[in-house]
C-alpha cells in the first residue's frame, strides 16, 4: 500500500504536532505492548524492570520514536532509510517481524489517547498506512 501525497501531508502535519511528546508516546506504546502482549517480554528479558514507566522502557520508547520521526522525513525511501535497522532486527536481535505490527498498533493507540482532537479518522488511516509501510521496510531483510 503506497502513501499518497495527502497521506504524506497528514503524516507530516500530525508528526509536527506530536513530536514534542514523542518520547512519552514511545514509552506508552512500548509499555502497552509489553503488558497486552506479554510474549514480547522475551525480547527485553535483559532489562531489570519491564514495568510501565521504567527507565528501560522510557529509554527504548524514545529510541523507537526517534526512528519513527526519522522515517517521517524519509517516507519516499523507507527501505533504504531503515536498512541498517532492518539488519539489526533481523540478524542481531532476531525480532519476529510480526511484532512490528503489534507495536504499530500500540503507537496508534497512544496517539489516539493523547491527541484525540488531532487524531482524526483521516490521520488514523494515514498513520496506519505509514506504520505498516515502516514495518514492511523493517522486515525487508527477513526475505
UniProtKB/Swiss-Prot annotation:
UniProt binding sites for heme b: 89
Q: How is this protein organized at the quaternary level?
A: Heterotetramer of two alpha chains and two beta chains.
Q: Which InterPro entries match?
A: Globin, Globin-like_sf, Globin/Proto, Hemoglobin_a-typ, Hemoglobin_oxygen_transport
Family note = Belongs to the globin family.
Report whether Transcription shows up as a keyword of the record: no
Q: Which GO terms describe its molecular function?
A: haptoglobin binding; heme binding; metal ion binding; organic acid binding; oxygen binding; oxygen carrier activity; peroxidase activity
What's its job?
Involved in oxygen transport from gills to the various peripheral tissues.
Q: Which residues bind O2?
A: 60
* Miscellaneous field: This fish has two hemoglobins: cathodic and anodic. The cathodic Hb and anodic Hb display small and large Bohr effects respectively. In addition, the cathodic Hb displays a reverse Bohr effect and appreciable phosphate effects.
Q: Where does the Globin domain start and stop, copy by copy?
A: 2-143
Upper lineage: Eukaryota, Metazoa, Chordata, Craniata, Vertebrata
Q: Name one GO cellular component term.
A: blood microparticle
Q: Gene3D superfamilies, from UniProt?
A: Globins (1.10.490.10)
N-acetylserine PTM positions read 2
Keyword Transport among UniProt keywords? yes
Q: Which keywords describe this protein according to UniProt?
A: Acetylation, Heme, Iron, Metal-binding, Oxygen transport, Transport
Tissue localization of expression is: Red blood cells.
The protein in question is named Hemoglobin cathodic subunit alpha
Residues of the signal peptide = none
**In its UniProt record, which GO terms are filed under biological process?**
hydrogen peroxide catabolic process
Amino acid at each position: 500500500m503506497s502513501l499518497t501525497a495527502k497521506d504524506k501531508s497528514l503524516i507530516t502535519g500530525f508528526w509536527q504536532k506530536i513530536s514534542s511528546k514523542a518520547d512519552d508516546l514511545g514509552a506508552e506504546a512500548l509499555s502497552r505492548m509489553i503488558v497486552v502482549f506479554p510474549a514480547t517480554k522475551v525480547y527485553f528479558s535483559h532489562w531489570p524492570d519491564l514495568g510501565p514507566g521504567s527507565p528501560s522502557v522510557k529509554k527504548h520508547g524514545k529510541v523507537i520514536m526517534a526512528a519513527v520521526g526519522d522515517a517521517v522525513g524519509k517516507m519516499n525511501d523507507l527501505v533504504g532509510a531503515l536498512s541498517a535497522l532492518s539488519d539489526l532486527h533481523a540478524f542481531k536481535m532476531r525480532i519476529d517481524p510480526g511484532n512490528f505490527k503489534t507495536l504499530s498498533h500500540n503507537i496508534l493507540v497512544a496517539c489516539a489517547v493523547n491527541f484525540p482532537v488531532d487524531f482524526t479518522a483521516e490521520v488514523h488511516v494515514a498513520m496506519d498506512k505509514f506504520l505498516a509501510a515502516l514495518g514492511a521496510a523493517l522486515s525487508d531483510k527477513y526475505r
